Amino acid sequence: MILLPCYIFGAQSVLIDSLTIFIFEQVNMKKEYPVKHLGAAQIPSSLPISSSSRYEDFKFVNDDNCILHDVAVSSINEEQAPHSFEQAGPRALSYFDSSKVRAGIVTCGGLCPGINNVIRTIVMQLHHNYGVQRIHGFRYGFQGFIPSYQHDIMDMTPENVRNIHNLGGSILSSSRGPQDPVEIVDCLERNNIRILFCIGGDGTLRGAHGIAEEVDRRNENMSIIGIPKTIDNDIPYCVKTFGFETAFSKAVEAVQAAHSEAYGYNYGVVIIKLMGRNSGFIAANTSLACPDVNFVLIPEVPFTMEGEKGLLHSLESGFEAKKEQGRHPHSVIVVAEGAGQNLLGNNSNERDASGNIRFKDIGAFLKENIQQYFKDRYPVNIKLIEPSYMIRSLPANPHDAIFCYYLADHAVHAAMAGKTDMMVGYWNGHFTHVPLEVVIKDQKRINPHGEFWRQVLFSSGQPGDMYSPK
């Protein structure tokens, strides 16, 4: 594979699977960012796995095992080893004594299908496979560590998590916003917790890295493991995040209903606003799965409303083309919440609890401008649908449930082996260990010059360029 030049963040575009090309900096994880380890693991693993098994899937994983960054390259430099990740999986030796160690779990940020699946698997794996008896859940995100909030700490047992995978949301609840790593580590020390699993998105992973740094400053032996969670699917070095498939599958149902609504009127227009602050994966995947969509607007691809190439003229041209073909003039527009913010004059420094810039409502903006433009042209009937919060509060679908199990399973193996300051990633069909230091440097975004976006354009039929400079 030839690495294409990148047009966002000055990085490189990297092939991850057969369809999607993401954009972020390419680095050699194993060489430049080795996974941190608390020390030598010396306790034989209690897992029923043999180092000498002739079946590869039933062997312990060695720290030297690598997952290649690229499955295809244009050439190989003999003097430079291929870029790779450390492979996830059970190790033959454990760092922590399972009869003594205590573990904690926290969920932060927005809800996402599959959180409870991850919690359940962590508890079950720690208890049944490693024999860890004391597992605690911290409620309401990082607030749960701070005494002033007075949140109770939950005892997590196999019995009280047995059926939680059938529920949406998080049994630990959540909150947004950072907390002082010093206070968090103080809480961990007070409760003698040596392993902490942080389930969350980019803000949570930044927080987890801050906790790991504070632990390191104190020279404490604590394992801090991140598990990526976001329906925006924008965590780098992870092909997909859990819950994403469930979320966009539900969004497809909304688009199908929207198409029926648009088709029910002459010049019917329905706008579906979906989540996606800086990355348009939900909008793009939903549109590709539902080819009734005519326009897909994402943060990675700028567009204008006015001008010959603008959205309004393109929408009008679509109406005229359908009339000429004897077809019913209507249109379905899918837009990510972070798209077109430059058109709304969003130069505000106002931020939410997570530190994200507060976006203005692109859905309402599109509706108002389309109504105004067609007022004296066509009798458009326009509606705005926002299924955002409905699609993220569902239980995980079967495929996501399996993915959650694998993520949590590998997180437990990493923690018991003494790994720390790392995230469990998923790359080229394998689970990996990715240092948080590099994860928090970037976001995964759609490459507007890549195969995936080209397929979205072909499916929707929208122009490849809807930007008219003034």
Task: Cite the ranges covered by each PLM segment.
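Short glycine/serine/threonine-rich phosphate/pyrophosphate-binding segments
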Residues: 112-122, 145-146, 180-184, 202-210, ...
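N-terminal phosphate-binding or glycine-rich loops at protein starts, especially the Walker A/P-loop
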Residues: 29-45, 96-146
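C-terminal non-catalytic interaction/assembly regions of soluble proteins
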Residues: 27-55, 348-470
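Glycine-rich oxoanion-binding loops at beta->alpha junctions
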Residues: 63-96, 144-194, 231, 242-249, ...
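Accessory alpha-helical/coil subdomains and C-terminal extensions
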Residues: 187, 198-200, 206-221, 241-380
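Glycine/threonine-rich beta-strand-loop-alpha-helix active-site module
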Residues: 124-151, 209, 215-258
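Short glycine-rich or small-residue beta-strand-to-loop segments that form or flank ligand, phosphate
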Residues: 102-112, 170-173, 194-200, 226, ...
